[in-house]
Amino acid sequence: MMKTNGMDIGLVSAILPDRTLEEVVGFAAGRGFDCVEIMCWPVGKAERRYAGVTHIDIDRLDEHATEGIRQMLQRHGMRISGLGYYPNPLDPDESKSELFIGHICNLIRAADRLGVPVVNTFVGRDPSRNVDDNLRVFAEKWPPIVKLAEAHNIRIGIENCPMYFTNDEWPGGKNLATTPAIWDRLFEIIPSPAFGLNYDPSHMVWQMMDPIQPVLDYAHRFHHVHLKDAHVDRERLKRVGIMATPLEYHSPRIPGRGDVDWKAFFEALDRVGYKGDACLEVEDKDFEGSSLDVERAIDMALVHIRSFVPTKS
């Protein structure tokens, strides 16, 4: 018997880009979510799908705005699980790297003001350089970010998405924190408990890795969890092989429509005593025809998730 009532289920706000913060929070509350991960990109044009969403503009987050957000959350009986911003902090263009890191640092300060415990992001990567070269740059750029997080009592959750899907990210992808072997090296460089993972099992599926074992091995580093599924088209994979760009053989799916064994996943979280937040992330193209399709995807996924993690009584 699972005892997952210690875990809260939330919604990643990126799938509702055209709604206001209060509309997102109200929608999530009405659907039966416990919390929300709020996207906090700088205001501007998105460079990729699901990016560039600004539900909180932290550049305008003064004391009055902060108090307004607190009161709004209280009205809806909701809270924010984490502030999300997913750029490439190790971008080879130094001006971009500095801009991205600067916003992450501002996000840490904003999380402190809002009383939000986690900032979720990517480590980043120069896709044209190998892992060792990128680790050297990581060792230069990331320790000051984590020191700032420690000073503000904020945890950083690094998502394990390789950010490699098409030729646009070829050959290495735009995020270094992709596998347990690399996580170990990142944690050797930055052993701080403030630096951990925003774990998404779907990314292990299409890398042909076990999505359950990391729960057992790295639970102490789990600061946040994303609930997303993925389906690997085995017939297509037979034709294109693992050297193809990943979207040639796999598709992101809502939980229950892909290859993740969600019963085993939640049992593993239960076994390790995870009591953090797990937020549904919707990136399923089969449900992008209209806002009603998006809502249907959210509802279907939540029904599946709640079969393992019931609503708290």
Show the residue positions of the predicted features.
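Active-site acidic/histidine proton-transfer and metal-coordination neighborhood
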Residues: 23, 67-79, 89-199, 206-207, ...
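Flexible loop residues that form catalytic
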Residues: 41, 88, 124, 161, ...
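Residues that cap or flank secondary-structure elements
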Residues: 15-16, 60-61, 99, 136-137, ...
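Short, basic/glycine-rich phosphate-binding loops at helix/coil junctions
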Residues: 80-84, 244-246
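Glycine-rich, proline-tolerant flexible connector loops at the mouths of alpha/beta enzymes
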Residues: 39-68, 129
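Conserved beta-strand positions in the central sheet of alpha/beta enzyme cores
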Residues: 37, 82-84, 120, 157, ...
